[in-house]
């Protein structure tokens, strides 16, 4: 096996004293297994794991699948109580401690490696806004004790390269004692290669729904909530607000098979499976929250929807109709402005621009109007600042954002948790890629939850908005149903 970089190259980087970690890597052919099979092997070793995949708008599978297991630590925060492995701290600034952790893991980028080589993986919940904007906080019911943050630190990563048909194994080393660390990483990677070839796969029961799926708000309650929101809109408090409803059912077993089904039912730019201490998440989200790559910030507002046509001709007619819909365009433009304002808070003056406006993005079942907003991050800001500036997305809150969040707390009166938050990674090079936590199923305390929302404006019809929430939940509910029969 060949290992990169060489020990001589590591020595040189260590002596420069710019970085304190770097990834040692090796490669193997991938023709003997699949990412799903590898996950089954790793889940037998560690219940704490993740899988990140991608499918493009034309349903072509993305190049890389990232897998991690055996995290160095799990970091959670709920209502200002931060757990860093075995340490507990009271804080109203979780990002301060996350920054301290990441400061111990500053890595160079290597052109021969994929975009993610190790870092923090997990989620920032919708309610994380209360740390950066305390005025948005409202006392809401949280019987399920949903965390505000749940991240795991992975210094070992497996990447499947679907183009070159190979697996890249990566283990990060600390440069302080680089020779000992290098030898440790080489041995670790050899053992990992052996595990992938010969490891035993987990024998897991398919997840089972126990009883009916029930909404948090029945139709009458949800419609009443919509009418209250429309009053706030008429009074000029807000222009738009996104009101959500939560579906839940008792559940036993794992969500891994649900993820396997969901990725085939709903191929999406962001597909993820995440298993922590007390939560499991399976999702397929179409929408980026915020991305930071080599100092460039991007957010991709996505709003305005039509179903996909049965033929290319019908697709083009629906595209034309969507781009001529003034109401859809007005709503989309409001979100583009919100994206510019959000990035403007952390970007260098004069660098925020709309890179792409009103393009049609096609997905497996629907098409959306998409735009791209770009900015250059300021030297004194980082990925954590970007998350605080953008979370939650306007498509999951409303406009103006802070007032919409305050009213969501009052009207919904139950903690959203993961839904509407950010799922993804912050890596050891300072880059970040996060999606909006929608089209997800998550399991906690013997229950499974699926949540979805509808954008409320002045002329919204409450009954239609209730139905829209149910329609948006369909792909996850269908995946839960089908997964019960999957081996």
Give the role of each language-model region.
Residues 1-487:
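Extended alpha-helical targeting/anchoring segments
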């Amino acid at each position: 096996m060949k290992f990169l970089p060489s020990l001589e190259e590591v020595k040189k980087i260590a002596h420069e004293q710019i970085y304190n970690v770097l990834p040692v890597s090796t490669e193997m052919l991938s023709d003997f297994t699949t990412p799903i099979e590898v996950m089954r092997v790793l889940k037998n070793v560690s219940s704490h794991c993740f899988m990140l995949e991608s499918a493009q708008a034309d349903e072509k599978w993305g190049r890389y699948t990232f897998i991690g297991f055996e995290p160095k630590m799990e970091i959670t925060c709920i209502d200002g109580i931060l757990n860093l492995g075995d340490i507990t701290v009271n804080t109203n600034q979780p990002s301060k401690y996350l920054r301290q952790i990441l400061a111990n893991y500053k890595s160079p980028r290597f052109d021969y490696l994929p975009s993610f080589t190790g870092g923090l993986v997990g989620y920032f919940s919708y309610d994380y806004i209360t740390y950066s904007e305390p005025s948005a906080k409202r006392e809401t019911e949280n019987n399920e004790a949903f965390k505000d943050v749940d991240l795991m630190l992975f210094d070992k990563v497996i990447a499947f390269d679907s183009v070159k048909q190979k697996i890249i194994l990566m283990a990060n080393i600390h440069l302080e004692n680089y020779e000992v660390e290098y030898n440790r990483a080489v041995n670790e990677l050899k053992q990992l290669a052996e595990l992938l070839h010969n490891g035993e796969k987990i024998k897991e029961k398919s997840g089972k729904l126990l009883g009916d799926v029930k909404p948090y708000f029945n139709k009458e309650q949800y419609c009443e909530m919509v009418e209250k929101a429309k009053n706030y809109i008429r009074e000029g408090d807000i222009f738009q607000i996104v009101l959500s409803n939560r579906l839940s059912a008792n559940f036993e077993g794992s969500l891994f098979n649900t993820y396997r089904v969901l990725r085939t039912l709903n191929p999406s730019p962001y597909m993820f499976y995440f298993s922590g201490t007390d939560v499991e998440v399976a999702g397929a989200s179409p929408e980026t929250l915020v991305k930071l790559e080599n100092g460039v910030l991007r957010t991709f507002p996505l709003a305005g929807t039509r179903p996909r046509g049965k033929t290319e001709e019908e697709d083009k007619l629906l595209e034309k109709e969507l781009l001529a819909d003034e109401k859809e365009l007005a709503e989309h433009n409001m979100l583009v402005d919100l994206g510019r304002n959000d990035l403007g808070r952390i970007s260098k003056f004069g660098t925020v621009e709309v890179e792409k406006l009103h393009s049609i993005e096609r997905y497996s079942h629907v098409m959306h109007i998409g735009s791209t907003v770009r900015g250059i991050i300021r030297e004194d800001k980082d990925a954590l600042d970007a998350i605080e500036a953008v979370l939650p997305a306007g498509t999951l809150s409303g406009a103006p954002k802070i007032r919409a969040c305050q009213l969501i707390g009052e009207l919904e009166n139950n903690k959203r948790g993961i839904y509407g938050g950010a799922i993804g990674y912050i890596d050891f090079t300072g880059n970040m890629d996060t999606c909006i936590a929608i089209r997800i199923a998550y399991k906690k305390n013997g229950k499974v939850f699926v949540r979805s929302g509808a954008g409320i404006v002045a002329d919204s019809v409450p009954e239609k908005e209730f139905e829209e929430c149910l329609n948006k939940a369909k792909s996850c509910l269908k995946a839960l149903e089908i997964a019960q029969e999957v081996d």
